[in-house]
Each structure stands twice: as C-alpha cells, then as structure tokens.
C-alpha cells in the first residue's frame, strides 16, 4: 500500500520540534515509510509553510526546505504522483459533498490517493470521505 503523505504529516517528519513529530515519525518508521508518495500540492504546502518566517520552528528559505525534503524524496520507497485528476470528474468525486472551500485541497488529495489505489495518510479527522467515491477505504487517519 502506498501512502500519500498529507502536509500535516510531512511537516512533523522534517521538524523534530513539532508537537506531532513523535507520532509522525513513529508511524512513518513502522508503516508509512515502506511505500509513500508526495505530489505537487503536498510538496508546495510543505515549502510554503516551513519557509514562512512566521512558522514557529522556521527552518529557512524555500531552497533550504527543498534541499531537506529532497533528501527524503531520494528514498527508494518514495513515489511522486503528478496531478492527473480533476475535482470535476464524477467518477472520482461527489462534488456535492464538498461543503466548504477549505475542504477542497484535502478532498483532492484523498481523491488522488484513491485514484492511485493508495491511501491518504493524515492527522486530520475532519476530511469528508463521502466526497470521494470509495473515499473511506482510501483514508488513513493517524493518531496523535
């Protein structure tokens, strides 16, 4: 099983001072690190948040965060999933189930994981899996 790592998993994996570092690292070491994926949205989110000087554990400019993440991407267990789907595809998404604009990215990531026959690994318990056809099977919520 390939796990698409949500931004809320990637950040604590790279930030050892993050409140969820132990949970993320423990799960990744035991389960997720055996076969995992990133995509343009998760990589962009990681760079955007961790390179923001207002981030509590600011680690540097985007180029520095990218270098740190590239180390992880070079793992043989890593897969890169390109953006190959659309929220407008009724074979993947039930757009009527997306009730808030803030949910769009999470639903898209869940749909991408489902499309790739993987799972979205996240700490977020609020993702509406009904917005993705077969979404419940593709959602893997990690305990904090």
Question: What is the predicted role of each segment?
Answer:
Residues 1-38, 50-64, 132:
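Short, well-structured N-terminal submotif of metal-dependent ribonuclease cores
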Residues 24, 105-106:
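Amphipathic coiled-coil/heptad-repeat helices and related helical stalk/stem segments
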Residues 31, 72-73, 113, 131:
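A generic structural signal for well-ordered alpha-helical segments
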Residues 85-99, 110-144:
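Acidic, PIN/NYN-like endoribonuclease modules and their adjacent C-terminal/linker elements
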């Amino acid at each position: 099983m390939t796990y698409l790592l949500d931004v809320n998993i990637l950040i604590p994996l790279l930030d050892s001072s993050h409140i969820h570092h132990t949970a993320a690292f423990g799960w990744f070491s035991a389960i997720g690190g055996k076969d995992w994926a990133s995509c343009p949205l998760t990589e962009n989110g990681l760079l955007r948040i961790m390179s923001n000087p207002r981030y509590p554990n600011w680690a540097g400019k985007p180029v520095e965060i990218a270098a740190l993440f590239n180390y992880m991407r070079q793992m043989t267990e890593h897969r890169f999933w390109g953006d190959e789907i659309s929220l407008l595809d009724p074979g993947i998404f039930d757009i009527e189930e997306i009730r808030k604009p803030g949910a769009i990215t999470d639903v898209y990531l869940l749909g991408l994981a489902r499309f790739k026959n993987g799972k979205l690994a996240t700490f977020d318990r609020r993702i509406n899996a009904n917005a993705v056809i077969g979404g419940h099977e593709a959602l893997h919520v990690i305990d904090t």
